[in-house]
């Protein structure tokens, strides 16, 4: 016997999407996902922001606001924001815009830069437009847009605690951006999830930023989760030239050398993962890590959170 049904498009009232325009940068697609309880009077929440929102927002949303999370998740309620690029601009535009936004000044004449140029030219030949060029150098402007324009504007519409301990997520070139922000004293973020950072890009920019920060500060109050895939390190020349593995271990070593009093790091080379497979696993592990709720790393905190969750369920059942 056939079952009758009337399918309808699934939607959620807790997910908004819109476009904004940043002077000197262009259009951005913004996704916002709200936690349960966001409409309670006086409620305020920290922000979890993913650059490359086209690629990473959905993953973060599932981990934080998906069905499993709403039933038995232990992560604290947060507002998830994705900052991405309009799909109608095409892949070549996406490729050069993110390269510009995520890096500081970089001539891109080195072998890695030339390889990125070659990929861009292939994308440009496929879908244009003809007047765009591959470039870098927009880190300061893009960070200023996030810090001074986007976050305050979002807080006028959504229940964001602007003084909260916000999280930044980035992958690949976005991971490079995360590390630049990590050592940026003006960054509005204090939790960082850095996935497969392109450590070999931009003429040692990460090393220079770290040294500059260390010369002027005696502490770094952050929670950092940094990782890459085991397969990214030694199985393919282009991936190896990006220095994903070197970025993870160098940052871990510098944290050990500097011994910042309030700097916390959790790092991992993830087995059986490559540059295209690591993201969801890394985001899930990273969110638990920077909130001190990762099993095997924060066992006491996990047990306490489990007990609190059980107690909350008991109260609701009475």
Range-by-range predicted roles:
Residues 1-318:
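Non-catalytic cap/lid and distal C-terminal segments of serine-dependent acyl enzymes
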């Amino acid at each position: 016997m056939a079952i009758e049904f009337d399918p309808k498009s699934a939607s959620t009232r807790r997910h908004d999407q819109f476009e904004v325009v940043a002077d000197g940068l262009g259009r951005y697609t913004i996704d916002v996902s709200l936690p349960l309880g966001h409409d309670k009077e006086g409620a305020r929440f920290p922000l979890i922001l993913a650059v490359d929102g086209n690629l990473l927002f959905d993953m973060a949303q599932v981990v934080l606001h998906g069905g499993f999370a709403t039933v038995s998740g232990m992560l604290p309620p947060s507002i998830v924001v994705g900052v991405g690029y309009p799909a109608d601009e095409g892949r070549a535009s996406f490729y050069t815009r993110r390269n510009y936004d995520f890096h500081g000044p970089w001539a891109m004449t080195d072998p890695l830069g030339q390889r990125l140029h070659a990929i861009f030219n292939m994308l440009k030949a496929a879908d244009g437009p003809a007047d765009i060029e591959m470039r870098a150098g927009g880190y300061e402007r893009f960070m200023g847009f996030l810090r001074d324009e986007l976050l305050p504007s979002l807080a006028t519409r959504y229940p964001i605690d602007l003084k909260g301990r916000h999280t930044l997520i980035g992958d690949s070139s976005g991971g490079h951006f995360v590390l630049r922000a990590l050592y940026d004293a003006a960054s509005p973020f204090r939790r960082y999830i850095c996935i497969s950072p392109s450590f070999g890009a931009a003429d040692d920019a990460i090393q220079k930023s770290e040294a500059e920060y260390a010369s002027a500060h005696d502490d770094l109050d952050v929670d950092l989760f940094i990782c890459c895939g085991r397969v990214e390190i030694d199985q393919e020349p282009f991936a190896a030239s990006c220095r994903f593995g070197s970025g993870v271990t160098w940052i871990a070593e510098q944290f050990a050398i500097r011994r910042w009093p309030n700097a916390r790091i959790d790092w991992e080379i993830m087995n059986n993962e490559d540059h295209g497979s690591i993201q969801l696993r890394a985001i899930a592990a990273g969110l638990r890590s920077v909130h001190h709720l990762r099993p095997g790393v924060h066992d006491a905190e996990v047990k306490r959170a489990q007990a609190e969750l059980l107690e909350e369920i008991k109260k609701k059942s009475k």
